[in-house]
Every structure is written in structure tokens, then in C-alpha cells.
């Protein structure tokens, strides 16, 4: 379960330390545009391992702390790289390779970032593909990182509960 979340330079401006109550509700208040909804979305993105969300958000570092006292999981953004406890992920490196997959005749582009698979009528977004590609590449160990450590990291997140 999450105990605390620390944001450094959310939207390039705000530094927050949010302590979450174990036995109750934590209320987040503030003026419009100060990040309340973004904080909730970042918690969801953390638990669903949504790298795309973190690649598009404006921040320097977000740290998630567990009640179990485990080492916090820190997500940093440096240019086009997302660094999760030392593991570097460059989302832009994957986009070209993913888009090459859509040059097959059964994919039809329906707008700037969505395609339809004519075989199944499934609509596929670019974000979904990038997320799937990142997860499969890192989990399969096809990139030059230590796959076992990354799998342990994923397991650690999955064991955390709301």
C-alpha cells in the first residue's frame, strides 16, 4: 500500500509531499491547475505501469513510498528518457519500430494516432502499442538491461496494494 508520494517540479513548478492515511481517506485540495487530478492519474499510471503517461507528464521526479518500508520507487524524467530506479526507457526510440508494423495491408489508419485491424475490426492506438512494446521488450530481456532485476521491480509494484 502507498504511504507517501513525493513530486519534484510537477508542471515544472510544484513540489509536493503527500502522506496517505492508512485508516481512512486522504483529501487533496487546492486551486484549479495545481495538479490534483494529475496526482490521482499518476497513482493509476504507477499501478498499471503506464510509461506513456509518465513520458508525457511535465515533472522532474516522482517517488512512491510503501507502508512496508521498502525502497521507494522513483520515476525521473530527463529529456526523452524515463528512469525508473536506474532503468532507462526512451519512449521515442520505440515509435519508429512500432509504426513500421503498421505498414502491413490489413492495418488502416483512421486518424493521426489510431489504426484499425481489418481482420478483427479492433481499433489500436499508438499509445497502446508503445506501452505493449515497452512491456514486452523489457520483460523479454531483448534490451540491454538485467531482465531479472526488471522483473523483480515489476513484481514489487504488483505486490503493492491501494
Language-model regions, residue ranges each:
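N-terminal pre-Walker A segment at the start of P-loop NTPase domains
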Residues: 1-14
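Short, flexible loop/turn elements at secondary-structure junctions
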Residues: 9-11, 68, 109-112
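A generic local structural motif
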Residues: 13-15, 49, 94
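Conserved A-loop
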Residues: 17-20
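Phosphate-binding glycine-rich loops of NTP-binding sites
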Residues: 22-62, 66-69, 74, 80
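Electropositive, glycine-dotted interaction segments
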Residues: 80-162
Amino acid at each position: 500500500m502507498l504511504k507517501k508520494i513525493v513530486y519534484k517540479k510537477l508542471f515544472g513548478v510544484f513540489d509536493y509531499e503527500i502522506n496517505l492515511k492508512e485508516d481512512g481517506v486522504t483529501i487533496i485540495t487546492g486551486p484549479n491547475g495545481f495538479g490534483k487530478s494529475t496526482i490521482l492519474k499518476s497513482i493509476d499510471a504507477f499501478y498499471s505501469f503506464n510509461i506513456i503517461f509518465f513520458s508525457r507528464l511535465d515533472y522532474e521526479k516522482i517517488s512512491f513510498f510503501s507502508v512496508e518500508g521498502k525502497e521507494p520507487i522513483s520515476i525521473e524524467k530527463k529529456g526523452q528518457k524515463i528512469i525508473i530506479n536506474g532503468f532507462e526507457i526512451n519512449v521515442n526510440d520505440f515509435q519508429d519500430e512500432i509504426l513500421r508494423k503498421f505498414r502491413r495491408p490489413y492495418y488502416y489508419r483512421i486518424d493521426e494516432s489510431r489504426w484499425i485491424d481489418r481482420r478483427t475490426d479492433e481499433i489500436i492506438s499508438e499509445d497502446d502499442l508503445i506501452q505493449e512494446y515497452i512491456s514486452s521488450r523489457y520483460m523479454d530481456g531483448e534490451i540491454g538491461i538485467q531482465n531479472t532485476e526488471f522483473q523483480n521491480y515489476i513484481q514489487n509494484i504488483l505486490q503493492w496494494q491501494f
